[in-house]
UniProtKB/Swiss-Prot annotation:
The organism of origin for this protein: Halalkalibacterium halodurans (strain ATCC BAA-125 / DSM 18197 / FERM 7344 / JCM 9153 / C-125)
Gene: mtlD
Official protein name in the record: Mannitol-1-phosphate 5-dehydrogenase
Catalytic activity, reaction form: D-mannitol 1-phosphate + NAD(+) = beta-D-fructose 6-phosphate + NADH + H(+)
InterPro entries: 6-PGluconate_DH-like_C_sf (IPR008927), 6PGD_dom2 (IPR013328), Mannitol_1_phos_5_DH (IPR023028), Mannitol_DH (IPR000669), Mannitol_DH_C (IPR013118), Mannitol_DH_N (IPR013131), NAD(P)-bd_dom_sf (IPR036291)
Gene Ontology annotations for the cellular component aspect, listed alphabetically: cytosol
Amino acid sequence: MKAIHFGAGNIGRGFIGALLSKANYEVVFVDVNAQVIDRLNEQRSYTVLTADEDNEENVIHNVRGLNSRTQMEQVLAEIATADLVTTAVGPSVLPHLAHPIGQGLLQRNGAPIQVIACENAIGASSMLQEYTKASLSEEEWSKVDRVTGFPNATVDRIVPAQDHADPLTVSVEPFYEWVIETKSMKGEPPTIDGVTYVEDLTPYIERKLFTVNTGHAMVAYLGFQKGLMTIKEAISDQTIAEKTRQALAETKGLLVHKYNFSPEAHDEYIEKIFKRYNNPYLSDRVERVGRNPIRKLGYNERLVKPARQLLDLGHQPTALLAGIQAAFAFFVEDDQESMELQEKRQVQGLEQTVVEVTGLPAVHPLVQMIVGNN
């Protein structure tokens, strides 16, 4: 079996590619990074380290790479004979994959295939499906659509900043979760150990977004506000830890209301998340976790979405509000979005910036709360 994976970065190698290799797929990584691709082709393997006290070493075999800048014809040919296509490139890169994926799928012999976007965004595979459809004629899309599933997925594994002699080596936390929705598949689901298949992904997407991502953002933005350097330092601060717990209690109430999750099971999930944040071997910098604040303060994102939905239910998102306000003050010179955010504040003021970034009207109570308490 062969999987084509777009994105040979840390998540691609340390999570998706590693699981696919262990499931007996030959993994063909596609990336623009010539150094990584050349190294993959030289070594045909790489090492994944577990970021904990055991520091377990796993060698991932049966891998190679293609440079999408210089080897696009080969990329299309590989898609034509693949059993699975996956991505981990970042949501903003997905539009650029539509043309090669569409053209590669057109060359196939009619065997069913799944294209799974493993991105930190809701409905990423559906987005990729729309981009791919737009890149093809109606007749071409009809041919592709008959045998190609674009099942949505949610992925969760913290990959800390890396510093290894071998640029292919990657450290990852022990915990991971990869959940794939079955209802939009064509043909049988791929057999991959460690993957959970569900009929409806929405509850699992929001559980992760409103817990893992919300909590991570709270710790990062509140930690930055206090001048702390790492997630470990920030979560060790009693005030920040308590405020983050309060925020996750707020989102827990929302998730239990919307999806009937077991409150006890969700409490266990939250404790697992806190254990991950406290892992000294992950020790990510708050500046890195907090980057791209404009995206992370979006209407359907980790802080604003649960806060506005709680207000709709008549509940006050007090702790979430603290995280949102801290995010609007986030500024790191080498992060383009945080620089843009502070520029907007200086030029047009906080209220107009909040309206623009969150997509909420100025009269919305959440906008007034963000502006009023600053």
